[in-house]
């Protein structure tokens, strides 16, 4: 199971890197969002079931459990990732409305303007 999860995380990182390296701003935002999902999966994979972990307050008849701290961290990361994605989408939309362009190469401008 861990090997499958590791392969999924690697695939998400590959797709995120591919999207971030494109010139389209929307693809870059989607790539950053995919990176956050891969990071959340990495954190969740750290809290897998273990035979040595037992419920802390119940002595007899206890069962294996997953660390709730990692789940709280991932929930917080999901909210932060959603807010960041929403902010970046608004920023890209505003940039498109002002410049009528959505590619990074066009938005860089001319080097002659920077020298003057």
UniProtKB/Swiss-Prot annotation:
Topology versus the membrane: Multi-pass membrane protein
Subunit composition and interactions: May form a heterooligomeric complex that consists of seven subunits: mnhA2, mnhB2, mnhC2, mnhD2, mnhE2, mnhF2 and mnhG2.
Record key words, sorted: Antiport, Cell membrane, Ion transport, Membrane, Transmembrane, Transmembrane helix, Transport
Gene3D superfamilies: 1.10.287.3510
InterPro entries: CPA3_antiporter_subunitC, NUOK/Mnh_C1-like
Gene Ontology biological-process entries: monoatomic ion transport
Species annotation: Staphylococcus saprophyticus subsp. saprophyticus (strain ATCC 15305 / DSM 20229 / NCIMB 8711 / NCTC 7292 / S-41)
GO molecular function: antiporter activity
GO cellular component: plasma membrane
Protein name: Putative antiporter subunit mnhC2
Subcellular location: Cell membrane
């Amino acid at each position: 199971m861990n090997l499958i999860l590791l392969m999924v995380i690697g695939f998400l990182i590959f797709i995120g890197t591919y999207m971030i390296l494109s010139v389209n701003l929307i693809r870059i935002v989607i790539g950053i969002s995919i990176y956050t999902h891969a990071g959340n999966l990495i954190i969740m994979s750290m809290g897998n079931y273990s035979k040595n972990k037992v419920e802390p307050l119940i002595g007899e008849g206890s069962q294996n459990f997953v660390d709730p701290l990692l789940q709280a961290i991932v929930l917080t990361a999901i909210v932060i990732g959603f807010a960041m994605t929403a902010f970046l989408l608004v920023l890209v939309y505003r940039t498109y409305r002002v410049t009528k362009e959505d590619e990074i190469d066009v938005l860089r401008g001319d080097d002659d303007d920077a020298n003057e």
